[in-house]
């Protein structure tokens, strides 16, 4: 029915993706060889959102794995669910992008992109009613960022009316994996603003904090971080895959969350997050979920919602619970924290309830917020970008692949515009409508 084609690009994307498929397979009772071992009809009823059924009743993930070097793919293949993927869905080059966005977007990646699009077409044609695409990638590297955004643009061209969701790992405030991260991220955001429908922002530092502070893991591994991300990814589509009292899908999410087309960068969170030992001491109740969900420590990107205001938000509850109680609690939190919600969008919460909780929990909730505080993230990257770009540091790596300095300037100003748009709506009141229109006209003439 409402199929989603999943694409994972680059090392980060493939590692998150591999974890995600472990979680999804587990939810649907599919074992690592693709056999169904579940115990409930509901697990299999709408399994085709993410899986194709192959000969002999095997379930194969509708996943396309893309990378410019074979290393990560080999480790996915060797991983616990490595044998479940269809071999011709692996598309990889040999050269690598070397953390260079231009290599991913213009040279190496551009050579491989047609091979990927062929696989995308094949997978999409096999769908009854394709709902959209979800892409896992990071914005700091070469393949996930450069080639990932190239893929998004090309798929957008071919399927303009399908949803395009990305789970994007954004650079962290303090920890940097690569020196040229600000360049890669800014160039990627420039693409995502134009071509993606929904971007779920995740960053490693916030994930580390959750693992460290909330889950009390002394030395979290990437596996732990990726597990958190995959909880959110599975939560976003739980309503598609399991029956529920109030359904949501990718398009409903977009319609409810995006007040202006460019402002589609979301904060995500998940509840309950408790350390392994302390679960038995806490009751899972709807109020507990709601309060934890809105807690800034639960956000998977390093932006503090208390520094901005929510334009819109969505909460997806899973498990047996009373919808009345959910509605009361959501109303309650909006009244209590009314200063954190913009007043010119009345009741700006979208709620959905799905009956089947994640494995091992009685109830859970996924939170997606469109908050103006996400501008902190872009501001931070923008400052790092300008610091390097002012001296033209590292630029030769990009111009050597045929890029123009002009592109950097454009990307920078696009991201700065995005920041000021968020800022403008953060400060807006109910009765200031007229002023804005004049300002906008003025902005176009500059």
Swiss-Prot record:
Sites where the protein binds GTP: 11, 69, 138, 142-144, 204, 226
UniProt xrefs under Gene3D superfamilies: Helix hairpin bin (1.10.287.600), Tubulin/FtsZ, C-terminal domain (3.30.1330.20), Tubulin/FtsZ, GTPase domain (3.40.50.1440)
Compartment list: Cytoplasm, Cytoskeleton
Keyword Nuclease listed: no
Keywords linked to the UniProt accession: Cytoplasm, Cytoskeleton, GTP-binding, Magnesium, Metal-binding, Microtubule, Nucleotide-binding
Molecular-function GO terms, alphabetical: GTP binding; GTPase activity; metal ion binding; structural constituent of cytoskeleton
Region of interest (Disordered), ranges: 427-446
Matching PROSITE patterns: TUBULIN (PS00227), TUBULIN_B_AUTOREG (PS00228)
Binding site for Mg(2+): 69
Biased composition, class Acidic residues, residue ranges: 429-446
GO cellular component, one term: microtubule
BP GO annotations: microtubule-based process
Cofactor entry: Mg(2+)
Coiled coil regions in record: none
Subunit structure: Dimer of alpha and beta chains. A typical microtubule is a hollow water-filled tube with an outer diameter of 25 nm and an inner diameter of 15 nM. Alpha-beta heterodimers associate head-to-tail to form protofilaments running lengthwise along the microtubule wall with the beta-tubulin subunit facing the microtubule plus end conferring a structural polarity. Microtubules usually have 13 protofilaments but different protofilament numbers can be found in some organisms and specialized cells.
Role description: Tubulin is the major constituent of microtubules, a cylinder consisting of laterally associated linear protofilaments composed of alpha- and beta-tubulin heterodimers. Microtubules grow by the addition of GTP-tubulin dimers to the microtubule end, where a stabilizing cap forms. Below the cap, tubulin dimers are in GDP-bound state, owing to GTPase activity of alpha-tubulin.
PANTHER family with a match to the protein in the record: TUBULIN
Family: Belongs to the tubulin family.
Name under which the protein is recorded: Tubulin beta chain
């Amino acid at each position: 029915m409402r199929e989603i084609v999943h694409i994972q690009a680059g090392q980060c994307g493939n590692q998150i993706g591999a974890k995600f498929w472990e979680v999804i397979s587990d939810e649907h009772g599919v074992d690592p060889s693709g056999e169904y071992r579940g115990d409930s009809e509901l697990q299999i009823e709408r399994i085709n959102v993410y899986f194709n059924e192959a000969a002999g009743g095997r379930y194969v993930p509708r996943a396309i794995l893309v990378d410019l070097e074979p290393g990560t793919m080999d480790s996915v293949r060797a991983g616990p669910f490595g044998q479940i993927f269809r071999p011709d869905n692996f598309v990889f080059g040999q050269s690598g992008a070397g953390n260079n966005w231009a290599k991913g977007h213009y040279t190496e990646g551009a050579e491989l992109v047609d091979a990927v699009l062929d696989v995308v077409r094949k997978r999409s044609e096999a769908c009854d009613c394709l709902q959209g695409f979800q892409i896992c990638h990071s914005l700091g590297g070469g393949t996930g960022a450069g080639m990932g955004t190239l893929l998004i643009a090309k798929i957008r061209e071919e399927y303009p009316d399908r949803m395009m969701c990305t789970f994007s790992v954004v650079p962290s405030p303090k920890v940097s994996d690569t020196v040229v991260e600000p360049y890669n991220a800014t160039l990627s955001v420039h693409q995502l603003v134009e071509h993606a429908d929904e971007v779920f922002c995740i960053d490693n530092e916030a994930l580390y904090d959750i693992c460290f502070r909330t889950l009390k893991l002394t030395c979290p591994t990437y596996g732990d971080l990726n597990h958190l991300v995959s909880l959110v990814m599975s939560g976003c589509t739980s309503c598609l895959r399991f029956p529920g009292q109030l359904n949501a899908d990718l398009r409903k999410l977009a319609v409810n969350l995006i007040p202006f087309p460019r402002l589609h960068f979301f904060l995500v969170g998940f509840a309950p997050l408790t350390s392994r030992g302390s679960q038995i001491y806490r009751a899972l109740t709807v109020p507990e979920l709601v309060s934890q969900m809105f807690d800034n420590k639960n956000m998977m990107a390093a932006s503090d919602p208390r520094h901005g205001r929510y334009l819109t938000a969505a909460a997806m509850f899973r498990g047996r619970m009373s919808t009345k109680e959910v509605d009361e609690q959501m109303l309650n939190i909006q009244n209590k924290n009314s200063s954190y919600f913009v007043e010119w969008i009345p009741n700006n919460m979208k709620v959905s309830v799905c009956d089947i909780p994640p494995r091992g929990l009685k109830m859970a909730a996924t939170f997606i917020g469109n908050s103006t505080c996400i501008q902190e993230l872009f501001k931070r990257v923008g400052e790092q970008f300008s610091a390097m770009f002012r001296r033209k540091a590292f630029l030769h790596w990009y111009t050597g692949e045929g890029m123009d300095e002009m592109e950097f300037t454009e990307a920078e100003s696009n991201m700065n515009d995005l920041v000021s748009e968020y800022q403008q709506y953060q400060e807006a009141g109910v009765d200031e409508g007229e002023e804005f229109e004049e300002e906008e006209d003025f902005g176009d003439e500059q």
